Amino acid sequence: MGDWGFLEKLLDQVQEHSTVVGKIWLTVLFIFRILILGLAGESVWGDEQSDFECNTAQPGCTNVCYDQAFPISHIRYWVLQFLFVSTPTLIYLGHVIYLSRREERLRQKEGELRALPSKDPHVERALAAIEHQMAKISVAEDGRLRIRGALMGTYVISVLCKSVLEAGFLYGQWRLYGWTMEPVFVCQRAPCPHVVDCYVSRPTEKTIFIIFMLVVGVISLVLNLLELVHLLCRCVSREIKARRDHDTRPAQGSASDPYPEQVFFYLPMGEGPSSPPCPTYNGLSSTEQNWANLTTEERLTSTRPPPFVNAAPQGGQKSSSRPNSSASKKQYV
């Protein structure tokens, strides 16, 4: 029961990271092969060598005739077929587990770097490198890995290997045994003294079992080919969508503008219906306001007494530094 539990865990892991056709193939593989071989295979082929009888008393003749009739037992041949066909799937599962562990380590390292109080350039470069590596691992919202990039390549190679192995084992079974189990096998091999007739037990039941396993093998091969077509269509549709998005992206802005469209705020440069003129101070222009200030200052100066009445200016002394009215007017103008 422990072995079945281990196989069940492997089945769950592979089904989570497979396509719809791949899940159907796994169902065919585990139900119609493992269960049939485990439950009915031993009961049908258990007496294969013990009930193989030949019409001779020569010692060793029955063994060599059985070896000639069955170079490898059917049940062992199907077990080898199951192991070889399942190996590419297990390799793909190992790649999935490796990417999952790597994604977890990258997230943990990213959290440790973001928790640091100081952000020096080395930390920023390390975070950028981690984000670049995590971008290569496509993870869905539910935590499963998407079949993209390197994982897609591994998956396609595994399906190709399964198809080749499936076709090879079907051809080998046809070359070794054919499609039916004959009730009488004619043997002529040393140390048999002459042509010997050997008899197989339950040939009709074994013929039905052989045909059933051949049909299961053909179904598995067809499913593998359908999965290859499905993956090819998926990659082509994704490439077409990416090119379409790339072509429609520059159409959002002008063709001559290489920069993305941005929003800028401009101040009104002239008067218009949407921008009323700015009101002036007291309705006067700047020149008129300067003249008004100059007149007020002269009026205040004429009414104020001079600060030094007793100090008469001498001959060589300079005059007052206040400019005359014409100079002031020029200054203010």
From Swiss-Prot:
Main location: membrane
Low complexity compositional bias, start-end: 318-333
One Pfam family in the UniProt entry: Connexin
Cell membrane found in the keyword field: yes
GO-annotated molecular function: gap junction channel activity
Record keyword Cytoplasm present: no
BP term (GO), one: endothelium development
Transmembrane segments: 21-40, 77-99, 149-171, 209-231
Chain spans, region Disordered: 292-333
Extracellular side, ranges: 41-76, 172-208
Membrane topology field: Multi-pass membrane protein
Tissues in which the protein is found: Highly expressed in lung.
Cell location: Cell membrane; Cell junction, Gap junction
Keywords, comma-separated and alphabetical: Cell junction, Cell membrane, Gap junction, Membrane, Transmembrane, Transmembrane helix
Cytoplasmic side: 1-20, 100-148, 232-333
InterPro entries reported for this sequence: Connexin (IPR000500), Connexin37 (IPR002263), Connexin_CCC (IPR019570), Connexin_CS (IPR017990), Connexin_N (IPR013092), Connexin_N_sf (IPR038359)
A GO cellular component entry from the record: connexin complex
Family classification: Belongs to the connexin family. Alpha-type (group II) subfamily.
Record note on quaternary structure: A connexon is composed of a hexamer of connexins.
Role played: One gap junction consists of a cluster of closely packed pairs of transmembrane channels, the connexons, through which materials of low MW diffuse from one cell to a neighboring cell.
Protein name per its UniProtKB record: Gap junction alpha-4 protein
Native source species: Rattus norvegicus (Rat)
